[in-house]
Regions:
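Internal mixed beta-strand/loop scaffold within catalytic domains of large alpha/beta enzymes
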Residues: 1-64
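Charged, compositionally biased interaction regions
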Residues: 68-358
Length: 358
């Protein structure tokens, strides 16, 4: 079917505590005044909907298109269930988002959106929705019954702009880098909030569907530190959804450099001791690897400790490094040597007194 909602902001409210949620959910057009609203299990709009339905009421909802890019950023990020994306928008942007109350839903709506639809999602009102090419690079969820919005009011500007997000595989997924940055920032922030010390960096690999692989770099400070960091990174709100591989590396490894991460995995991890599996974790119907599709909301995660073993860290074999002076000399003459591409980026160099240590 035709999809209107890809790069969008969906506004809902928790009827129990009045928390306003802003999320990004796909919306397939059903008719001239009906549009689908698919939410993966555990996502906030779906939880809000279930609460409204448990009260015997339809859920009020607003669908917003042509939105401020920062609003899309926060809408596509996983925050704690009791936090509103509007608050993060104001914190990042330095001022509150300009809103007005919708007269159909009573929800605070972004005043600068190009198009806004207001309506309700009614219990037991579904239609056959999908499939849709998703962020994994697959038509992940087979067509299935999905709730839809009965649109009661439409607002739009003259000649409005409709924002869209291209879903594809690998580097063709324009949202991959976008989501990778958001996920990494949220994981890093969550770990800091939980008091994990020694954090040096976090990154999610864009080519791994943005969310599939996350790397955390730490300066080990005590026994169990690496295990603590990798386990919390896997299950914090920023990292819990869908991600399959979480890797922790030492502070001399750049988590954004896949080559360095792979080298650390190959030379510092011990497969029999360094790999743990978490089962029954938060996943999604959009994951094509799990079949039959009914089991997809329950996933698993592989945790890899690619740090030097802490109990023997002082005896760990010294790392071979190039001198910084030699590196700079080669970089300066890179083109003279007729070498293709850019010089490799290095950020770890031999200590001046290294020779006296071996």
């Amino acid at each position: 079917g035709k999809y209107l909602g890809t790069a969008t902001a969906v506004i809902t409210r928790d009827p129990e505590n009045n928390r306003v949620n802003v999320g990004t959910y796909r919306q397939m057009i059903k008719s001239k005044d009906e549009i689908g609203l698919y939410t993966s299990p555990g996502k906030d709009a779906g939880l809000d909907r279930d609460k409204w339905w448990a009260m015997g009421k339809p859920m009020p909802v607003a669908l917003c298109y042509g939105i401020d890019p920062l609003l899309f950023v926060v809408a596509a990020t996983s925050f704690a269930k009791n936090e509103s994306e509007y608050d993060y928008y104001g914190g990042i942007g330095g001022e509150p988002l300009e809103t007005f109350l919708g007269d159909v839903t009573g929800l605070p709506l972004p005043a600068r959106a190009e198009i806004i639809l207001e309506g309700h999602v009614y219990p037991d009102a579904t239609f056959a929705e999908g499939p849709f090419g998703e962020f994994t690079g697959y038509y992940g969820r087979p067509a299935g019954e999905t709730p839809y919005v009965r649109v009661e009011k439409v607002r739009y500007r003259d000649d409005p702009t409709l924002t869209c997000a291209l879903m594809a595989d690998g580097k063709a997924n324009e949202a991959g880098l976008f989501w990778a940055m958001l996920r990494a920032a949220k994981v890093w922030n969550d770990l800091e909030k939980m008091g994990v010390p020694g954090l040096k960096g976090a990154w999610s690999v864009p080519e791994a569907a943005g969310w599939g692989i996350t790397v955390v770099s730490i300066k080990q400070m005590y026994a169990g530190h690496a295990s603590q960091a990798v386990n919390l990174a896997a299950q914090c709100m920023g990292g819990a959804y869908f991600g399959k591989y979480v890797i922790v590396v030492d502070d001399d490894i750049d988590p954004t450099n896949v080559n360095e991460v792979l080298w650390a995995m190959a030379t510092r991890s011990r497969p029999s001791e360094s790999i743990d599996i978490l089962r029954e974790t938060w996943s999604t119907y959009l994951d094509p690897s799990q079949n039959p599709p009914e089991i997809r909301p329950w996933g698993s995660k592989c945790l890899i400790n690619a740090c030097m073993e802490y109990k023997h860290i002082n005896e760990f074999s010294p790392r071979t490094k190039i001198s910084e002076n030699m590196y700079k000399a080669v970089v300066e003459r890179w083109d003279d040597y007729g070498l293709d591409g850019d010089a490799p980026r290095l950020n770890v160099f031999e200590d001046a007194d290294f020779k006296g240590k071996i």
